[in-house]
Each structure stands twice: as C-alpha cells, then as structure tokens.
Swiss-Prot record:
It holds the Pfam family Elong-fact-P_C. Pathway: Protein biosynthesis; polypeptide chain elongation. PROSITE patterns: EFP. Involved in peptide bond synthesis. Stimulates efficient translation and peptide-bond synthesis on native or reconstituted 70S ribosomes in vitro. Probably functions indirectly by altering the affinity of the ribosome for aminoacyl-tRNA, thus increasing their reactivity as acceptors for peptidyl transferase. This is Elongation factor P. The gene is efp. It comes from Brucella ovis (strain ATCC 25840 / 63/290 / NCTC 10512). InterPro entries: Elong-fact-P_C, NA-bd_OB-fold, Rib_uL2_dom2, Transl_elong_fac_P/YeiP, Transl_elong_KOW-like, Transl_elong_P/YeiP_cen, Transl_elong_P/YeiP_CS, Transl_elongation_fac_P. GO terms for molecular function: translation elongation factor activity. Belongs to the elongation factor P family.
Length: 186
C-alpha cells in the first residue's frame, strides 16, 4: 500500500532501497525556506542497521503489512530454536542469532509473536516481562541506604541485572526483557 512520505509514523514498516525498514522515530520539519519534509529514523528489519532519511510530502513509499502469528516455544536443539504454530501445530525452526541475546529468556511453552513477510520470518517479539529466579546475589553492604542503590545479581538463565538490596538468592523476580531491568518481586 503506497503512502505519502509525511504519513510515515513510528512502527510503520516500509520498503526502501530494496529492504524492509521499520520507522523508529519521525519528526515533521518545516524549514523557513523550501518545502516541509518528514525526518525519519529507520531500522533495517533483517540486519538491524540504522538509517536517517528525509521524505517530502510528495514522495510515496510502499508500506508493508506484516503477518503476525503466535507461536509456542518448544525446545532448543543445538543452535536452533523450535517453535510451534498454535493454530496449525506446524513447527518452525529459527537460529539463535535470529532471536539474539533475548533467546536466554525463552522458557518451555512461552508464547511469542513471529512477524512474517511473504511467509518468511523477519522478526520475533517475546513477552515484555518474564519471571525468573535469582541464583546469585551479592550481600547487602551496610551504609548504602542514603541513596537508591542497586547490587548485581545473576538470573537462572545466566544474565546479570541490577536489583535492589533487599533481593536475595533464590527469590523470583519479574524482569523487563527489552531493557534487561528488574521490575518487581514475583
């Protein structure tokens, strides 16, 4: 579907320079001289590179509709991650590097959303929050109560995050998978 350059909004996926790009930020600019344009920060969906482009209102770009399907994580097999389509029960195999660092957050039966373009997976979205156990937490140092302080802790999946001083080993916490930050106790 063709849209004008000034209609691009954050989250839109467009076809540009032979690739698929998602608009991260947009800024409508109206200079004193010359025509108005839309300054757009784009991120490539395949390799993650970023690009800043200007689109004039008269320019048209192809907006792409991505199909989003729900999958359930089944298991890990070497460097492959196996998911199952919840509607057709077909299995989908994705490489760990496709999911990236967030593959460590995958748990058996976890529901994820896979974005498909022409039946080919191009992106995956994990839940925003997961509940994990703390395996290691440094002891509290007395006298650090004057300012808000955090101490490092290791989650059951091996990822290190800062947590408040009252969290101890063995506790379950809710973690933000996008920012890798502590949210609350479970």
């Amino acid at each position: 579907m063709k849209i004008n350059g000034n209609e691009i909004r954050p989250g839109n996926v467009i076809e540009h320079e032979g690739g698929l790009w998602v608009a991260v930020k947009t800024n409508a600019v109206k200079p004193g001289k010359g025509g108005a344009y839309n300054q757009v920060e784009l991120k490539n969906l395949i390799n993650g590179t970023k690009l800043n482009e200007r689109f004039r209102a008269a320019e048209t770009v192809e907006r792409v509709r991505l199909e989003q399907k729900d999958f359930s994580f089944l298991y890990e097999q070497g460097e492959a991650l196996i998911f199952m389509d919840t509607e057709t029960y077909e299995q989908l195999e994705l490489q760990k590097d496709f999911v990236g660092d967030r593959a460590a957050f995958l748990q058996d039966g976890m529901m994820v959303t896979v974005e498909l373009y022409e039946e080919k997976p191009i992106g995956i979205r994990l839940p925003d929050q997961v509940t994990l156990a703390i395996t290691e937490a440094d002891p509290v140092v007395k006298g650090q109560t004057a300012a808000s302080s955090y101490k490092p802790a290791v989650l059951e999946n091996g990822i290190r995050i800062p947590v408040p001083p009252f969290i101890t080993s063995g506790e379950r916490v809710i973690v933000d998978t996008n920012e890798l930050t502590y949210i609350s106790r479970a």
